[in-house]
């Protein structure tokens, strides 16, 4: 089973990135963004909150200065892109289409001020699809209207796969009952998100015939197999990387031991069949 990182959760120039099957960059926007005021990260019950604000150098600096250094790590590169209009996504994908070292583009459809109604998501994916021939994975939020309906919409618009799920909005207060994050609320991630993420993956796997990267609380091999059981072809590690940067190697080893313990079969290149039930005597996953 392939292991990636969730966008923004690992520095691509560090040793742990070399243990991934693919590296996913932080989200890149057309123009540079300074990001949100600090504090930007807070540890909370069941996970963490983050409010980075899409800080990045912009697409031109990324392509010129950042991407060449990431390529040296030696793993396939997925670039996460985000914008505020269909034109933004088209611009980003058109620029990345020129980059041979980019194997896949992740469309972050959960950006601030981008309404993730199915018709809006479809419009954004269609604009990206017209701008590039590279594989496109649509990253969806669990706080969407009907995630299965949104999955069908982005599939019809040309998405090649799904990344499920992004964070869900949360708020934490300090001892003085003030927000612990500089921007107030932030994205909630970690183990507490896993049941929500599993439900979203299961719903989408039954709705569309696309590969799915499952994420949201994956901390060990058992978590990864649970995502495979509900339809994920691969998993991405996020919050766990902040406390255990070596998690990719550990989770990979645990997947192997768990498959022997519970008798699951991971067949490379094949997605699980989830048409009848979320549990199976045999599960196949890419």
Describe the function of each predicted region:
Residues 1-76, 83, 251:
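N-terminal capping/small domains of soluble enzymes
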Residues 3-7, 23-25, 77-81, 105-107, ...:
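Hydrophobic faces of well-ordered beta-strands that scaffold small-molecule active sites
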Residues 8-9, 80-84, 140-146, 165, ...:
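Glycine-rich beta-to-alpha transition loops that act as phosphate-gripper elements at the mouths
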Residues 14-17, 91-96, 144-157, 206-207, ...:
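Catalytic cores of alpha/beta
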Residues 28-30, 107-111, 163-171, 217-218, ...:
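Glycine-rich phosphate-binding active-site loops on the catalytic face of alpha/beta enzymes
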Residues 35-45, 173-186, 228, 240-266:
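C-terminal helical cap(s) of enzyme catalytic domains, especially alpha/beta-barrels
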Residues 48, 109-119, 150-210, 250:
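Glycine/Thr-rich beta-alpha phosphate-binding loop at enzyme active sites
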Residues 57-73, 119-138, 182-212, 251-260:
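Alpha-helix-loop-beta-strand connector modules within alpha/beta enzyme cores
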């Amino acid at each position: 089973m392939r292991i990636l990182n969730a966008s923004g959760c690992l520095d691509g120039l560090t040793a742990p990135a070399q243990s991934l099957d693919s590296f996913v960059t932080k989200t890149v926007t057309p123009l540079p963004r300074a990001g949100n005021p600090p504090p930007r990260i807070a540890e909370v019950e069941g996970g963490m909150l983050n409010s980075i604000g899409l800080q990045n150098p912009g697409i031109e600096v990324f392509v010129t200065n950042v991407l060449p250094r990431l390529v040296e790590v030696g793993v396939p590169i997925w670039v996460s892109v985000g914008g505020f209009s269909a034109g933004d996504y088209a611009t980003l994908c058109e620029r990345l289409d020129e980059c041979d070292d980019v194997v896949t583009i992740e469309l972050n459809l959960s950006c601030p001020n981008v309404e993730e109604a199915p018709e809006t998501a479809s419009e954004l994916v269609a604009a990206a699809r017209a701008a590039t021939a590279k594989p496109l994975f649509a990253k969806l939020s669990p706080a969407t209207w009907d995630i299965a309906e949104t999955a069908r919409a982005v599939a019809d618009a040309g998405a090649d796969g799904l990344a499920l799920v992004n964070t869900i909005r949360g708020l934490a207060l300090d001892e003085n009952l003030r927000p612990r994050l500089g921007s107030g609320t932030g994205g909630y991630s970690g183990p507490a998100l896993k049941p929500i993420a599993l439900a979203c993956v299961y719903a989408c796997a039954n709705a569309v015939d696309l590969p799915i990267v499952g994420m949201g609380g994956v901390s060990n091999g058992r978590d990864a197999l649970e995502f495979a059981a509900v339809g994920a072809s691969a998993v991405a590690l996020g919050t766990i990387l902040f406390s255990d940067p070596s998690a990719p190697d550990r989770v990979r080893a645990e997947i192997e031991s768990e498959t022997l313990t519970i008798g699951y079969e991971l067949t490379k290149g094949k997605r699980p069949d989830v048409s009848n039930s979320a549990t199976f005597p045999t599960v196949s996953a890419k």
